[in-house]
């Protein structure tokens, strides 16, 4: 499993850099490319990719210190990304020496001893380096950027816009584990009944005041592996996405134009508010994302929405008059 996860992570990070793909898109492409579809390997690879990307500025800084007088850019894409992953695995995941050795062996198996031999010296240095001392050695804005895992240009922009005190609060909050929210899907059944089914699967929820069917997850297992999720009893949805549909407030008689609609959180929420009556025209320019949208509409029992493959920057192939237009770019995973 570890070898497959390392192979997926190396290749996915490379696609992200080459074609500016998202974590999810690059992993989906790599899984198909390498024919690796094991759920455990994919889950492990996804965690590596997300955390390595989130901490990339610090990882690259430390890697370049370790590799000095050379740098990451002196090596192939595969070697560069394995060094990044090894740094995450050993310094941020806090692996023990046996786990670090197993990870290194997996990298050698994926890339080959010949490719990694020029940087073998770096792996021992990585184990002994103190990341905090590297961060303390940076100056001013660069130190703050490293300490909070943000790019310097973003830190500088926020300070100009918000001032230093508010920027510090923002940067620190960005590193907190985000709250998970779900929407109970009343297109499937009564809210009270659906809540009881989730409780049977060990999910603990806290309602949000003044907002119908939206709950904060207090305790959870893997939500997407639950039978209630597969049957469409609930949808995992960011709170800001929920507020879009609530603000639009569509009625059962409305025709809604949902632009940038995939993967479908807002579409399905509006269909729920409309009680599966009326009409939703769902526009997206990505055929791949519309396939995901269709899958979600089936899972969530949405019957009133029509997918339209089109670019909203061009004239749309429509003659209908919409009562409500929902435009919320950039949308999920853009």
Where are these regions (language model features)?
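S-adenosylmethionine
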Residues: 1-334
């Amino acid at each position: 499993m570890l070898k497959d996860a390392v192979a997926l992570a190396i290749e996915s990070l490379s696609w992200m850099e080459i074609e500016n793909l998202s974590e999810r898109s690059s992993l989906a492409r790599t899984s198909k490319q390498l024919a690796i579809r094991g759920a455990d390997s994919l889950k492990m690879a996804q965690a590596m990719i997300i955390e390595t990307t989130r901490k990339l500025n610090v990882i690259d800084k430390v890697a370049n210190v370790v590799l000095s007088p050379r740098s990451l850019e002196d090596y192939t894409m595969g070697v560069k990304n394995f060094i990044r992953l090894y740094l995450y695995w050993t310094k941020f995941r806090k692996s023990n020496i046996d786990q670090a050795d197993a990870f290194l062996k997996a990298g050698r198996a994926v890339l080959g001893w010949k490719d990694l031999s020029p940087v073998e010296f770096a792996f021992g240095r990585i184990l002994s380096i103190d990341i905090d001392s590297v961060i303390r050695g940076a100056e001013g804005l660069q130190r703050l950027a490293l300490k909070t895992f943000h790019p310097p240009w973003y830190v500088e922009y926020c300070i100009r816009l918000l001032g230093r005190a508010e920027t510090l609060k923002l940067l620190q909050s960005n590193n907190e584990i985000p709250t998970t929210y779900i929407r109970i899907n009343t297109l499937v059944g009564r809210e009270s009944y659906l809540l009881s089914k989730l409780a049977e699967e060990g999910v603990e929820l806290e309602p949000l005041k003044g907002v119908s069917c939206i709950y904060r997850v207090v305790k959870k297992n893997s939500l997407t592996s639950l039978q209630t999720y597969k049957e469409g009893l609930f949808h995992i949805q960011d709170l800001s996405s929920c507020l879009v549909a609530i603000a639009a407030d569509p009625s059962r008689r409305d025709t809604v134009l949902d632009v940038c609609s995939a993967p479908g959180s807002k579409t399905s929420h509006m269909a729920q508010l409309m009680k599966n009556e009326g009409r939703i025209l769902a526009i997206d320019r990505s055929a791949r994302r519309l396939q995901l949208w269709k899958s979600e509409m089936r899972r969530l029992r949405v019957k009133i929405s029509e997918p339209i493959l089109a670019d909203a920057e061009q004239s749309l192939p429509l003659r209908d008059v919409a009562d409500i237009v929902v435009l919320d770019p950039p949308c999920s995973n853009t």
